[in-house]
Design a protein with these regions (language model features):
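Acyl-donor binding region in acyl/amide transferases
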Residues: 8-11, 35, 41-42, 47, ...
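Class I (Rossmann-like) S-adenosyl-L-methionine-dependent methyltransferase catalytic domain
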Residues: 143-148
């Protein structure tokens, strides 16, 4: 697809968004739930990227006024993630939410977030994981990885 291709926003059903994330996301499975999803499609109507927005994963951030972009996934088409981060914030505000956050992992630049006007507000050190001898648990994919917390403008 050309760098000059025109992208537009499209509604995406939960199942379609989850399938897209399953195919294209680099390191996580689709999230368990969502409030809404939005997609970016090209001029031919081909879905090029999705954003899934839901309740914050961290309980202390789940205050009823905050949502979290829990996944974005793209087929590599330029500018799709910035488009989706901006659209997600506009949709969240229209639904009455006052805050939208997301996390990036160490090694991810955050260029799409900066392009959409988001602010880096905190850095989180790597977690040791949830496994304990009394309660064995499998890792969830982002243990031992530093993360950055971003907030919509």
């Amino acid at each position: 697809m050309s760098d000059k291709a025109r992208l537009h926003l499209v509604p995406v059903r939960s199942r379609e968004a989850r399938e897209f994330v399953h195919v294209w996301h680099r390191h996580h499975p689709p999230p368990a739930g969502q409030i809404f999803a939005v997609g970016a499609a090209d001029e031919m109507g081909t879905l090029r990227a999705v954003a899934i927005v839901g309740r914050p994963v961290a309980r202390h951030l789940d205050d009823g006024a905050t949502l979290e972009v829990t996944r974005t996934a793209s087929d590599g088409t330029r500018n799709t993630n910035s488009l989706l981060y901006g659209a997600s914030w506009r949709a969240a505000k229209a639904l009455g939410y006052r805050r939208l956050i997301t996390f990036t992992q160490e090694g991810e630049s955050g260029a799409s977030l900066r392009g959409a006007g988001w602010r880096l507000i905190a850095s989180r050190p790597p977690r040791a994981g949830w496994h304990t001898p009394s309660r064995p648990r499998a890792g969830n994919g982002n243990d031992h990885v530093a993360r950055s917390l971003w907030e919509a403008p």
